[in-house]
UniProtKB/Swiss-Prot annotation:
Entry note: cofactor: Manganese or magnesium. Binds 1 divalent metal ion per monomer in the absence of substrate. May bind a second metal ion after substrate binding.
GO biological process: DNA replication, removal of RNA primer; mismatch repair; RNA catabolic process
Protein name as catalogued: Ribonuclease H2 subunit A
Compartments it resides in: Nucleus
Phosphothreonine sites (modified residues): T217
PROSITE patterns cross-referenced by the UniProt entry: RNASE_H_2
Modified residues annotated as N-acetylmethionine in this record: M1
Annotated keywords: Acetylation, Endonuclease, Hydrolase, Metal-binding, Nuclease, Nucleus, Phosphoprotein
Gene Ontology cellular component terms for the protein in this record: nucleus; ribonuclease H2 complex
EC number(s) given by UniProt: 3.1.26.4
Function noted in UniProt: Catalytic subunit of RNase HII, an endonuclease that specifically degrades the RNA of RNA:DNA hybrids. Participates in DNA replication, possibly by mediating the removal of lagging-strand Okazaki fragment RNA primers during DNA replication. Mediates the excision of single ribonucleotides from DNA:RNA duplexes.
Similarity-based family: Belongs to the RNase HII family. Eukaryotic subfamily.
EC class name: hydrolase
């Protein structure tokens, strides 16, 4: 799989797709959606679709595709190579979301959580296939969150398509199994060949599974945290594991707004402004604009 586009710029998102088989432009097709790397604190999350004509679904099943988590890396790569050889009836596309994109989205002023990101990415890939004139008539999706809600959302967006969302869909439907293999092969390759934009001394590539509860991954995070700049962009700094290490190992920063929010005095209850007690005599704090410029209210001239 050629991920050179991602290797040139791994700070955002990258979409790749196979050529569309001619038969998929003419015959009704089934499409599967799955992801790899949703939970790890390291590396990208990859969403993939795989599609083929309904008339050739038995040929896809004959490849003996299975849930990627039950296969070894060599088995996944062998099956992906077979799907590439069968490009006359099998097509695919994938979206690679970088750790940097995931974290900045989750921690932005307007929060964009991982579930919403996942739903939108899956829908975007289905739309991508349709924009390429693939005759999609059935879609099978491995669920994120409540399957009923997710299915209703996709069905509303794609009213002309029969949508099925199930837990463990990657072990129930071969076309979803194929998508899971494609996603996992792409993520494994992306992680293995990750281009660090930071100049890191003594970079250790042995970071374990990348999952938050892996001791080797935690050790790697502690080793490569900078006390001022934090983690390299390979790390999803929005994950609680990374945040806990930052709080312990990095320099603390107090922002003015944070200090104001943590003020124990606070504004208090609204009824306190109408009381005659000592709190009613609390001096009013002027706006930050006036404090920064040393401006005070003049009571006399």
């Amino acid at each position: 799989m050629d991920l050179s586009e991602l290797e040139r710029d791994n700070t955002g998102r990258c979409r790749l797709s196979s050529p569309v088989p001619a038969v998929c432009l003419k015959e009704p097709c089934v499409l599967g959606v799955d992801e790899a790397g949703r939970g790890p604190v390291l590396g990208p999350m990859v969403y993939a679709i795989c599609y083929c004509p309904l008339s050739r679904l038995a040929d896809l099943e004959a490849l003996k595709v299975a849930d990627s988590k039950t296969l070894t890396e060599n088995e996944r790569e062998r099956l992906f190579a077979k799907m590439e050889e069968d490009g006359d009836f099998v097509g695919w596309a994938l979206d690679i979301l970088s750790p940097n994109l995931i974290s900045t989205s989750m921690l932005g002023r307007v929060k964009y959580n991982l579930n919403s990101m996942s739903h939108d990415t899956a829908a975007g890939l289905i739309q991508h296939a349709m924009d390429q004139n693939v005759k999609v008539t059935q879609v099978f999706v491995d669920t994120v969150g409540m399957p009923e809600t997710y299915q209703a959302r996709l069905q509303q967006r794609f009213p002309g398509i029969e949508v099925t969302v199930k837990a463990k869909a990657d072990s129930l439907f071969p076309v979803v199994s194929a998508a899971s293999i494609i996603a996992k092969v792409a993520r494994d390759q992306a992680v293995k060949n990750w281009q660090f934009v930071e100049s890191l001394q003594g970079l250790d590539s042995d970071y374990g599974s990348g999952y938050p509860n892996d001791p080797k991954t935690k050790a790697w995070l502690r080793k490569h945290v900078d006390p001022v700049f934090g983690f390299p962009q390979f790390v999803r700094f929005s994950w609680s594991t990374a945040q806990a290490i930052l709080e312990k190992e990095a320099e603390s920063v107090t922002w003015e707004d944070s200090a104001a929010e943590e003020d124990p005095e606070g504004p208090g209850r609204i009824t306190s402004y109408f009381s005659q007690g000592p709190q009613a005599c609390r001096p009013q704090v002027s706006h930050k604009y006036f404090q920064e410029r040393g401006l005070e209210t003049a009571t006399s001239l």
